[in-house]
A protein has these predicted regions:
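C-terminal motif of bacterial Sec signal peptides marking the signal peptidase cleavage site
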Residues: 22-24
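Long compositionally biased, domain-poor regions of proteins
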Residues: 40, 47-49, 86, 120-123
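Short beta-strand edge/turn micro-motifs at domain boundaries
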Residues: 131-158
Length: 162
């Protein structure tokens, strides 16, 4: 093997090693990965609502400066105020939801999810009632990388056909 081929092979080998190193140091999150991560976070949020109650779940997943917007009501500003409205009587109802889709901005600091919810409760006559709806949550990625809900809004939908 000539000296030219040896030096060229060595040079190419070094370039490959350096290129591989630089690529591994400059990996950016795949937007589809972050989108799936956000969708999974909303699913965990929904599961916590079933396990611990909606008030506790919202208290955990809302950003400190979150805004809650329920149909027919004034917006509720701040995580603590939203929690105060939800915690009393949370054992009297169940709020379940199923995230349908998530999207994340190219900057990966904002995203949104939407889905369908069912609010179940026992009325004054002891009969189980269900209210159906859809929601849209706007999420903000925190400094620690976790997603928190910045805006929670929802409105009612007709009951699904049986």
């Amino acid at each position: 093997m000539s000296a030219f081929y040896k030096s060229t092979s060595k040079f190419l080998g070094i370039l490959l090693i350096i290129g591989g190193f630089m690529t591994s140091c400059n990996i950016q999150d795949d937007p589809s990965t972050e989108k799936q991560r956000l969708l999974n976070t909303d699913k965990q949020f929904a599961q916590m609502s079933l396990d611990k109650g909606a008030g506790e779940a919202f208290n955990y997943y809302l950003a400190d400066d979150a805004m809650g917007m329920s149909a027919g009501q004034q917006p509720v500003m701040g995580r603590e105020n939203n929690y105060a409205e939800m915690k009393d009587g949370q054992e009297d109802y169940t709020l379940a939801w199923e995230p349908q889709r998530a999207e994340v901005a190219a900057s990966e600091d904002l995203g949104w999810t939407w889905g369908k919810y069912v609010l179940s409760f026992i009325d004054d006559e002891g009969v189980e009632q269900k209210r159906y709806g859809k929601y849209l949550n706007i999420w903000e990625r925190q400094d620690d990388g976790e997603w928190k809900v910045l805006v929670d809004m929802g409105n009612s939908s007709p009951a699904p056909e049986k």
